[in-house]
Amino acid sequence: MKTIKILIIIMIFAIIQMPVFDARAGISVAPDRHIVSLSPGEEMLVKYQVSNVGAKDVNITIAPEAWSGLKDPYDWLALQSDNVYVKAGESSPIVIGVSAPEDAIGEMVAMLFLCYKDTSESQLNIRNGVPLYMIIKGTEDYGLDIDNIEVTYTKNDNNVNDLNIIVDINNTGNVHIVPDVKVFIRNNNGKLLKEASLNRPNIVLRGKKHTYRLGWRNPFFKDGIYTVTAVLDYEDKIESVSKEAQFNVSDNNIEMIPSAKAGN
């Protein structure tokens, strides 16, 4: 079975990502996130580049906040400056020193909020965030469970049944993950009827849950029992996670089969 792949690229000072762009003020930020890996007590610098592609100068205040109730970011990061003035058509760096606390475990996550005013007549206050992840080397715990699989029918605009698959996952580890979620549907003879990926990759923070959904428009199922298998892949640290569920199709209705009956 494919082993788990987390979709992150760790570099010493930066990772290459598409920039964040806010058309309201003509601001873009690159990269759209940083993911760094440090040993306890280790320090480094990270840099974001803010570009003003608008027609007016912008004054930006940087305000880091803990994300998902994790350690206070001011315990492990220091801004070179909490304010940056960017002239129209120019760019400016945001430099941040990060230091892994000696007692840190798993991962620290901060959201760096860029606060400024809309340069249009509305003068609205704008607050955009870019994340900073710091993984603590040697303390990572990768864990993931599939809590539930559910299959239902819903009527579409043509009054025909569409199939809906819901997979609820739970990050039981202490670092964020970006799982690749796939589902496989087989008939009672084991023939593969459908293979599909669920949504685009989503970041699931430690201790958090996420629901993935798949819609299959106007499938045809004969009456009978079917098996749906969900498979989650991420970094090569643990084996893939999978779970099966069965459902019964009868007279254009779907009923989930309890796991004890399904033999799971």
Label every PLM stretch briefly.
Residues 30-32, 40-47, 92-94, 105-112, ...:
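Short, solvent-exposed loop/turn segments enriched in Ser/Thr/Gly
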Residues 75-103, 191-221:
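Intrinsically disordered, low-complexity Pro/Gly/Ser/Thr-rich segments with frequent PxxP/GP/PP motifs
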